[in-house]
Amino acid sequence: TLLDKVNESLIRETQAHGGVILLVDGFEDVLAVKSLSGDFPPPYGLPEDLPHKAIRVETNFRFAQFPLNETIFGAVACSGRGELITEPLSDSRIVQNGPEDFLRCGSYIFIPLKIKETVIGVAAVARRYGEAAFSDKEYRIASTLSDYASAAIKLIYSHQEVMEYAELTKEGDIACKLQSTLPPKLLPSVPGLSLGAFQRIADGICGDY
């Protein structure tokens, strides 16, 4: 998918060991993981009952959703500002989940994905514990790539909106034709009465015709 390709590009160009992309779900006010690749120690608190096994942790992360007011991902989405984390052990926003090597947090870069000034998601890359921290240069690379990613995502969203609108218009035309068949073609003749039928179709009334 597009997001997987963007994720791989971010990992490659910043020489990271793993990357993740999350998008905002506006209906539920959460960030949902859409792409996860490589080694990315989760910077959020794992569920207490989750076994510290690599495959179990990865699965938990891959299908995770985070409220916008929680985790470093939510903080970046809400502020609209990127973060370069070079000292995770002294950063209260980064949760250390355990002594296992694959859980030990190293350096991170978090970048908000924006369409104009609206944050639509967060992209992040990570390096393993003990490896050299990300530099300002790599932060700038991640920021530039994320800008391109946001533009590509915007094109996809715009295309989807056009297709959805076309489908709704088609359904509306069908509803309009059906409604036009409702008025009777002929009215009964009643002595002393003048009968007639009139119909005006309107759309957008409670989401229907």
Can you say where each PLM-predicted feature lies in the sequence?
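… and, occasionally, acidic/histidine-rich disordered N-termini of signaling adaptors
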Residues: 163-209
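A short, aliphatic-rich beta-strand micro-motif
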Residues: 106-114
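Short hydrophobic/glycine-rich mini-motifs in sensory/regulatory modules
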Residues: 113-123
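Amphipathic alpha-helical coiled-coil segments that mediate homodimerization
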Residues: 1-21, 72, 174-178, 194-199, ...
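Signal-transducing coupling segments at domain and membrane junctions
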Residues: 69-74, 78-107
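GAF sensory/regulatory domain recognition
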Residues: 8-11, 19-64, 68, 90
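Amphipathic alpha-helical "output/dimerization" segments
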Residues: 115, 133-154
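Short beta-strand-to-loop transition segments that serve as allosteric relay/switch motifs
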Residues: 122-132, 153
